Amino acid sequence: MKGSTLLLIIVAFVGLIVAVGASLLHNGLSARARPSALEELLARNAWHLAIPSDARAMRNPMPASEENLKDGRLHFADHCALCHANDGSGDALFGRGLYPKPPDLRQPETQNRSDGELFWIIENGVRFTGMPSFASEGMSPDSWKLVLFIRHLPQLTAEERIEMSRYNPKSPEDREEEKEEDEFLNGTAPQKSGMPNSHP
């Protein structure tokens, strides 16, 4: 019985590899098509296998103070929101084009991970996904503050999202447009050539 169970597991595993290989040969490696449920399952489970057990056991040394939470929130807005969106949904400009798509950080799939797992993913990234490494020397306080903020995402308020939008990266065009708006509102906008300064 034991030998037949092992044989069945091996056959199933080989069958799985053949199925994934056949799918890749048929569809190629394009990131345009939505991945199959099997591909998504394998990609998600790769995260768990990638994290060492001692890292999973780490606890966040940063107290959950308002200051630390705000630091994490603003850091997330500036560095993470392009892919994860300010609300952690993953519905962001770059996030929509990634494979696998960024997970919704508000959902149990992420919230049930240990602090150590989240920290490890932030610091080391995950191969074969769009998640890069943000490695730092030692135990980065910024990464631990991000863990605090990720825990807060399910309770994120509208006011916090508005504050975050001010810290999102901007293109040179966006910056120029903001500058022109500020100059106009402050009455310091340069006069366009050929336009009279005052009415006769």
Regions found by a protein language model. Give the residues of each.
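Soluble extracytoplasmic domains of inner/organellar membrane proteins
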Residues: 112-161
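A short linear-motif detector with a strong N-terminal bias
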Residues: 40-42, 82-85, 110-111
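Short microdomains enriched in Cys/His and/or Lys/Arg
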Residues: 101-112
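Residue-level detector of conserved, well-ordered beta-strand and adjacent loop positions
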Residues: 63, 106, 132
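Periplasmic/extracellular electron-transfer cofactor-ligation site
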Residues: 67, 73-100, 126-133, 154-159
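Short hydrophobic/aromatic-rich motifs at helix boundaries and adjacent loops
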Residues: 52, 89-91, 119
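Periplasmic c-type cytochrome electron-transfer domains
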Residues: 2-73, 113, 135-150, 166-200
